[in-house]
């Protein structure tokens, strides 16, 4: 084990969010507690309701802050603060940030605030998606694109939804769009260029991510995309502002947030974990774990200490790029020049805790070429059925008690990972384009045999309708009604269904994306059988207003209903397979069960010019609070408001949205979530949902480089 950094006051942040008791933080201000800071926020109009009170200190080992929302009369209470010197200030829509007031726990304050002098001044603290909504996309009748000698839209863009999808899943895969760094480009002087188009052309080529941004723009249609981004920037420079977001209302005013520093400006955290998803009572008050690049970040929320460890590999690994950036830049970064580290050879992606104190991690432990036992000619049951030649990422775990990394080789590519609720503690892994993989961790623990403990299945749909998998067509071949059909595509999200034991994956592309059900059967891999379901899209049986696209994350509630965030169209969608009239046969190719879907539009503005759904927000993933760790009830699905500085909780019984906004620092770019119950008897104080600032470009955040 090698400790590379102990983190102090800079870098990314880790946030715990909880909904406090029904009285709320504002009404609770009458409480008398030496660990609290209380008071009232006033303007010339009186008490200011629904604004955020931020208490932060630099006295602890990491950045530490708590944020609450004022009640109807402008009163507030910031509870249970560690003994330290704090700066307390107020941020709210329609206001300018207040002055900072020195305070210690036990103090009571009156914080005076003033209205913003202009709409432009007020809008500077709006979430990024509100600014991004000002970008005007090409009209639906301009698709499909006719290329650089036609309308400038890429020929591969078949319809407006694909363009919108690229503005989301392409342009926002690494960072927010609409923040100050992207809408105003303060890191360069636009006046140094012949036009704003030329400035944008330069901007998308800088840094190690430049080649990726460049190629993405080319697919959309470079000339047209640059014109639209330049027009967006010019209109904002001329004074155009988005509509004002609503202040927190109702239960949203009962939200309390605790934030601590972890990571740094360079070493991103991709995802975090706090407990075993199957039992959120495990590991109360224990550290929170995050992985990304080549590092494991461990933060103790009790002692406020954070450390980053270098991860190890089985074989020596050379310096390499990752899915976000290469190892070189054609044009130096305007922030970092050529200085930024490129050592990301381990490609750690996603963590998951089990019930035995092990932190399982999808990471690269060896070069990509698979060993012989994975390939054609092997006698491994899965390899003889469907051999795999290469794997870009494998598996490891961090033994929390022993403080050591253990590597587990896999033939299949890994990305996300989830434990099933079965006797074998089966760990299911996404990431391959062709198969879904698993590791029988009970067998692995008993034998130490990583080969015998793993298996995988291709995703083959029973389109012949005979109830089993026989001869099948390959991807790209015409459908044959007498044969089954193998599907491929990047398996992104994954989740086991606790009701029937089936495994579900989310495939993002092609538009509209799909979710795939895998039934393993009694004798895998031969008994594996898949089903595929797409959200309603270009379906004549469904009104276009109910179409959706761009599924990324996937999770399930305790009733077996699937939930997926449609990051392209801007929905949180549920899928109930029990409502489907058709499960297999020649029509079971994706659009055959619109009756199983319910689409809930997420809050926030739409992009200019969209003809159907096209929210300006981006939902990187989603998570279901199965066990009421947040305080809104069991089985509450939450979409990441990755572009809106928020977690978006849906109350499924009423269809009501609860927006959990993180107002400071701007740039709350979230990926994964986790919830933990530290003390079930302590009410809201004993539970919460954990999320992290997970942008690849933390320096874009408020207060960054």
Regions found by a protein language model. Give the residues of each.
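Short Pro-Gly-centered beta-turn/loop motif in secreted/extracellular proteins
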Residues: 48, 77-85, 93
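Short, acidic Ser/Thr/Gly-rich low-complexity loop/linker segments typical of extracellular
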Residues: 58-80
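The canonical Cys-X-X-Cys-His
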Residues: 168-179, 229
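Short, conserved, GDST-rich strand-edge loop motifs in beta-rich repeat architectures
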Residues: 181-188, 361-391, 433-459, 505-516, ...
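Structural signature of eukaryotic scaffold interfaces centered on beta-propeller domains
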Residues: 264-284, 338-356, 416-424, 483-500, ...
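Conserved beta-propeller blade signature
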Residues: 287-290, 297, 358-362, 426-430, ...
């Amino acid at each position: 084990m090698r400790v590379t950094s102990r983190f102090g006051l800079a870098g990314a942040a880790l946030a715990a969010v909880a909904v406090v008791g029904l009285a709320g933080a504002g009404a609770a201000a009458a409480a008398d507690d030496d660990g609290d800071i209380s008071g009232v926020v006033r303007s010339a109009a009186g008490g200011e309701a629904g604004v955020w009170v931020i208490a932060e200190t630099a006295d602890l080992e990491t950045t530490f802050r708590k944020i609450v929302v004022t009640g109807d009369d402008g009163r507030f209470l910031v509870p249970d603060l560690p003994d330290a010197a704090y700066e307390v200030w107020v941020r709210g829509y329609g206001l300018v940030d207040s002055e900072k007031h020195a305070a210690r726990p036990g103090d009571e304050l009156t914080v005076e605030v003033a209205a913003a002098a202009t709409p432009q001044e007020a809008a500077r603290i709006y979430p990024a998606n509100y600014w991004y909504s000002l970008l005007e996309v090409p009209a639906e009748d301009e698709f499909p694109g006719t290329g650089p000698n036609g309308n400038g839209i890429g020929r591969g863009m078949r319809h407006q939804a694909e363009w919108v999808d690229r503005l989301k899943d392409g342009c926002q895969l690494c960072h927010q769009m609409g923040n100050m760094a992207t809408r105003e480009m303060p890191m360069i002087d636009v006046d140094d260029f012949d036009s704003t188009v030329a400035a944008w052309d330069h901007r998308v080529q800088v840094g190690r991510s430049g080649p990726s941004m460049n190629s993405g723009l080319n697919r959309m249609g470079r000339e047209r995309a640059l014109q639209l981004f330049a027009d967006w920037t010019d209109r904002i420079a001329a004074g155009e502002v988005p509509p004002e977001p609503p202040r927190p209302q109702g239960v949203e005013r009962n939200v309390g947030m605790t934030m601590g520093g972890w990571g740094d400006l360079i070493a991103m955290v991709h995802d975090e974990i706090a407990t075993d998803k199957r039992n959120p009572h495990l590991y109360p008050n224990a550290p929170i774990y995050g992985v990304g690049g080549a590092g494991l970040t461990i933060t103790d929320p009790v002692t406020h200490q954070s450390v980053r460890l270098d991860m190890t590999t089985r074989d020596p690994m050379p310096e390499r790029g990752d899915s976000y950036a290469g190892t070189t830049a054609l044009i130096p970064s305007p922030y970092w020049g050529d200085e930024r580290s490129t050592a990301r050879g381990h490609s750690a992606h996603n963590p998951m805790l089990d019930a035995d104190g092990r932190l399982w991690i999808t990471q690269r432990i060896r070069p990509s070429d698979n060993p012989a036992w994975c390939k054609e000619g092997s006698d491994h049951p899965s390899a003889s059925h469907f051999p795999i030649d290469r794997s870009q990422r494998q598996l490891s775990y961090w033994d929390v008690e022993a403080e050591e990394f253990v590597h587990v080789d896999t033939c299949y590519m890994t990305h996300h990972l989830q434990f099933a609720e079965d006797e074998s503690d089966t760990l299911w892994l996404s990431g391959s384009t062709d198969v879904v993989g698993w590791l029988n961790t009970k067998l692995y623990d008993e034998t130490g045999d990583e080969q015998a403990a793993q298996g995988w299945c291709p995703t083959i749909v029973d389109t012949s309708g005979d109830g089993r998998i026989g001869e099948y067509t390959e991807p790209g071949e015409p459908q044959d009604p007498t044969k089954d059909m193998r599907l491929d595509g990047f398996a992104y999200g994954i989740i086991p269904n606790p009701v029937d034991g089936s495994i579900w994956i989310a495939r993002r592309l092609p538009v509209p994306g799909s979710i795939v059900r895998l039934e393993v059967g009694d004798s895998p891999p031969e008994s594996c059988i898949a089903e595929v379901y797409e959200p309603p899209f270009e379906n004549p049986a469904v009104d276009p207003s109910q179409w959706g696209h761009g599924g990324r994350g996937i999770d399930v509630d305790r009733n077996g209903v699937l939930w997926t965030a449609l990051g392209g169209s801007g929905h949180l969608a549920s899928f109930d397979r029990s409502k489907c009239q058709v499960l297999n046969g020649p029509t079971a190719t994706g659009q055959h069960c619109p009756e199983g879907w319910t689409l809930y539009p997420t809050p926030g503005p739409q992009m200019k010019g969209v003809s159907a759904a096209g929210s300006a927000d981006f939902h990187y993933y989603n998570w279901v609070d199965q066990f009421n760790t947040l305080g809104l009830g069991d089985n509450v699905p939450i979409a990441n408001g990755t572009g809106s500085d928020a977690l978006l909780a849906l109350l499924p019984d009423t269809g009501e949205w609860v927006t959990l906004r993180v107002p400071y620092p701007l740039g709350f770019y979230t990926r994964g979530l986790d919830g933990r119950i530290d003390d079930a008897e302590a009410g809201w104080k004993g539970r919460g949902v954990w999320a992290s600032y997970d942008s690849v470009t933390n320096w874009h955040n408020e207060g960054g480089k």
